[in-house]
Each structure stands twice: as C-alpha cells, then as structure tokens.
Amino acid sequence: IDALPKIIENHPDIKVLVAGPGDPDEIMKDVDPILHPRITFLGLLSEDEKRQFFKSIDLYIAPNTGGESFGIILAEAMATGVAILASDLSAFRNVLEDGKWGELFSTSDSVDLARRASALLADPLRRQSLASQSSEGAKRFDWPVVAEQIMDVYDLVSGNGEKVVLASGNRAWSKLIRGRGE
C-alpha cells in the first residue's frame, strides 16, 4: 500500500485490483483519499475467479512480507502466463528461481517495489517476456511432472535398504541422493 502513491504518480491511468483477505476500510485508512477511486478490493476469489483475475491483469504483484512456505499463489499466477513481481521471500525466490520466472523486489521495501513496478508497467515488452517465462516455469508444477517427482522419491527411499540423505539446504526432491552417510 505504501508503494501505491508513487506507482500511481508514475502511471496515472492505472487501476489497482487487490485480491485476498483483509478489511478494505482498515487497509484504506492509511491511503490518501484521492487514490481511493483507483483501488478496487475483490476479496477472496474462487479458483475460477482467480484464473480470470490473473488473465485480466498486466502485472501481478505479490507484496507478501512473510508466512509463505511454498508460494502456491505464484505457481497459480505463472500457470496463467502473467508477468510477476514478488517480494524476495525465500519461498518466492524458490518458486521464481531467483528471478528467472518473474522479478523480485526487496521485502517490505516500498521504494524498491514502486521503482520495479513502475519500470515493468512502462515496459510492455519486458512484461510480455516475463509472462512467457512464467508460463514456461509453471510447467514444473504440472501434475504429471510432480507425480513423477513423487514416484522418484518413493523409488529412492524404498530401494535396496540403502541410506538416503538430503544434499541441499532447500530440501528439493531433485537434490536427494542415495547411499551416502546419514
């Protein structure tokens, strides 16, 4: 919310849609009243509404400041092929592969958020490129891919009584190795 005045100043025709939980009156009390007509609260969305929402926007911004263990909302946005700008939470960095599938801004830094959002909104070719990249990145989360990874883990842990250790601090399944220590 703190980044909105600068974003709107840079893009005076922008319409801001806010989806998710929260009391609009509580959120808007700290927003300059002159900006109120530019902001629409949609509340919680059904799965179909969420897909329509993502397909209707030029840029999805995920300004989360914590509490994300995976970042499923980013995977959902990626599947619709929308350009993404997200806070650099660990979960979001992992889903976006450190910026490969979308751009990141410093968590809780409204100046960085406003700067990066304004730059993306001013650059339709960059947004189009990010949208294509995010759509490609979403394929990692398709059910056949995930099911294959799950089967690989089952095969790995049930094989020959050998020990299994994790080779990565990020606990990705693809980093599991067989037969080394504890």
In which residue ranges do the predicted regions lie?
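Conserved acidic donor-binding segment of nucleotide-sugar-dependent glycosyltransferases
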Residues: 98-99, 103-110, 119-124
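C-terminal alpha-helical cap of glycosyltransferases
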Residues: 143-181
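Glycosyltransferase donor-sugar binding loop
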Residues: 1-2, 15-28
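Short hydrophobic beta-strand element within catalytic cores of glycosyltransferases
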Residues: 59, 83-86
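Nucleotide-activated donor-binding/catalytic signature segment of Leloir-type glycosyltransferases, i.e.
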Residues: 27-48
